[in-house]
Amino acid sequence: MKDLIIVRGGGDIATGTIYKLVKSGFHVLILEIAHPSAIRRNVAFSEAVYEEKWQVEDMTCHLAHDIKEAEQIMKAGNPALMIDPNGEMIKQLHPIAVVDAILAKKNLGTTRDMAPITIALGPGFTAGEDVDVVIETMRGHRLGRIIKEGSAIPNTGIPGVIKGFGKERVIHSPAKGILRNICHITDMVSKGQLLAKIETPEGTIVDVAASMDGLLRGLIRDGY
């Protein structure tokens, strides 16, 4: 297929990239894992894995089960998504470019020989070695910068500060188990409010509470 770009990953930042590429006239195929764990699910095309299709603004991504179906979706002007964690479709379809938008903070297997142009978003890659170009994803003055030599700013592990709040904005699970959501994305919540429960392998229930007042921007899928 002409003007084909393959994007590895369909999370929120990947989705913004995909949206722009499709609007620019490219055919875009997204490769995802079988059970994506996007947090800002409402704006992540990876949700098509679970829902068969997912709309973000005026664009709808459709899950494809084979190459023929994917090509039909893309010819209609929509991004297609296939479950292909190892990138096997890259070898078969020979895209003009591969974009690693997994945002794993490390390279999970993307190489420069995958396509004439290879691009990676965020840290974990060296431009000129792992890929041709790295795009800075750290919020601030360098956000979106095109890096042709070197790497993006290393992951700090600390969320960006908004209105004086940083690490408080992200809540980590207090236990291993299955997530049972109580609140929903876009809910206004208060500090201490119950957001979800964790069902542990031992059969106990662990509460997950809000760490601050505010709007719930993201939440991993119920049952994950």
Region locations from a protein language model:
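Well-ordered secondary-structure scaffolds
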Residues: 1-224
